[in-house]
Amino acid sequence: MSDHNPLTLKLNLREKIAYGMGDVGSNLMLCIGTLYLLKFYTDELGMPAYYGGIIFLVAKFFTAFTDMLTGFLLDSRKNIGPKGKFRPFILYAAVPAALIATLQFIATTFCLPVKTTIATALFMMFGLSYSLMNCSYGAMIPAITKNPNERAQLAAYRQGGATIGLLICTVAFIPLQSLFSDSTVGYACAALMFSIGGFIFMMLCYRGVKEHYVDTTPTGHKASILKSFCAIFRNPPLLVLCIANLCTLAAFNIKLAIQVYYTQYVLNDINLLSWMGFFSMGCILIGVLLVPLTVKCFGKKQVYLAGMVLWAVGDILNYFWGSNSFTFVMFSCVAFFGTAFVNSLNWALVPDTVDYGEWKTGIRAEGSVYTGYTFFRKISAALAGFLPGIMLTQIGYVPNIAQSDATLQGLRQLIFIWPCALAIIAALTMGFFYTLNEKRFALIIEEINQRKNKEMATEEKTASVTL
């Protein structure tokens, strides 16, 4: 730690692990909804599948704008206390996020319109609290380190944490829910346990991570939601990353939402979901561990594109030959191994675009950049929640009965073809239009530091003249 150059200064292992714990916690709360809420709506609340899709669409569009609000709040902060610029939002938003994550899985006996209204309101409230918590958590990376390799490692730890959270949700939620003879009670109790666990991990993150580089917003700069949009369109690398992420997150979430239906009705073994989750998430963890080394050897963009190729190949193989349990798990592992590199680097690339924006405009606005980026992610999540609900209705899905051949074929297309097509679009977008490579990034950081040193020298000279 004797090296004080921000570009080479290294973080200790404890802080990296603590940062990764944040995404364990947030994903324990988020992924129970991503994976099981649509099924809870259709099978427990008795909603038509398209009702669930509309709820996802409305609530996720709402939370896209709450992300922008979070960015506005972050960039508006002037007096930064000892807790830092971002950490207080993690501390205070984790409680309502955990509480509402549980309430979403409590069944009611109201009529369908009332059930739908309650479900929509709860989903929107969860989105608001989750935005305050998770956007602050993600936007914190530039304040933790300026070392690009350390940022890649933090992103890898974050993706590792997200993978562990997703793995636990995939492997443990249904077995926990099945312990109860009353399925509705099982959903509520399982959600409660996951929410408590998520809250604990968020607190471990809060206590273990420090903000080492807190840049206050310039006095003449006023944050606004409009500026979050402008931060995207005035920042070409960020815009390209947003478009690619729109595709990758939609593909990933569609796959997660449909896999519970696929294992139950196509493979006739819903318990296979736990085994598939165990092996495929294990492959993701291996991929995440390889991210720092592969990035160091080949660069972020090349590793990102290689991950996209693996993802697409795994889905194509599964569509044609994934009709039994063994091949489904095996080819899913290939696809999820590819997603490890893609999802890790989605986060590692965002801090680089923050620095690009500062270099281009002279204003450092982590909140606006990050929440502009997450706005696209929420739009993607809205579509990923809406499309399965609508498509389940279109293919003739009826809960808790044997499905027709047309419905089974529709499920296969939903879980494999749609994600594969979106992955290919994302790969083409990044391959042709993302130009912020490692060499250019180093030059940008060097120029930013030169500007700051020049400004400091000017201020010191002015102060000495005044005295």
Swiss-Prot record:
Q: Which CDD domains match?
A: MFS_MelB_like
Q: How does it sit in the membrane?
A: Multi-pass membrane protein
Tell whether Glycoprotein is among the UniProt keywords.
no
According to the record, the signal peptide region is none
Question: Where is it localised?
Answer: Cell inner membrane
Q: What happens when the gene is disrupted?
A: Mutant fails to grow on sulfoquinovose as a sole carbon source.
UniProt keyword annotations, A-Z: Cell inner membrane, Cell membrane, Membrane, Symport, Transmembrane, Transmembrane helix, Transport
Query: What InterPro entries is this protein classified in?
Result: MFS_2 (IPR039672), MFS_trans_sf (IPR036259), Na/Gal_symport (IPR001927), Na/Gal_symport_CS (IPR018043)
**Does the keyword section mention tRNA processing?**
no
Looking at the UniProt entry, the stretches that span the membrane are 17-37, 54-74, 88-108, 121-141, 160-180, 185-205, 238-258, 275-295, 303-323, 325-345, 379-399, 414-434
Q: Which GO terms describe its biological process?
A: carbohydrate transport; sodium ion transport; sulfur compound transport; transmembrane transport
A GO CC term? plasma membrane
**Superkingdom per UniProt:** Bacteria
Q: Classify the main location.
A: membrane
Q: Which GO terms describe its molecular function?
A: sulfur compound transmembrane transporter activity; symporter activity
NCBIfam families annotated for this entry? gph (TIGR00792)
Q: In UniProt terms, what function does this protein have? A: Could be involved in sulfoquinovose import.
Q: Which family does it belong to?
A: Belongs to the sodium:galactoside symporter (TC 2.A.2) family.
Q: What is this protein called?
A: Putative sulfoquinovose importer
GN (gene name): yihO
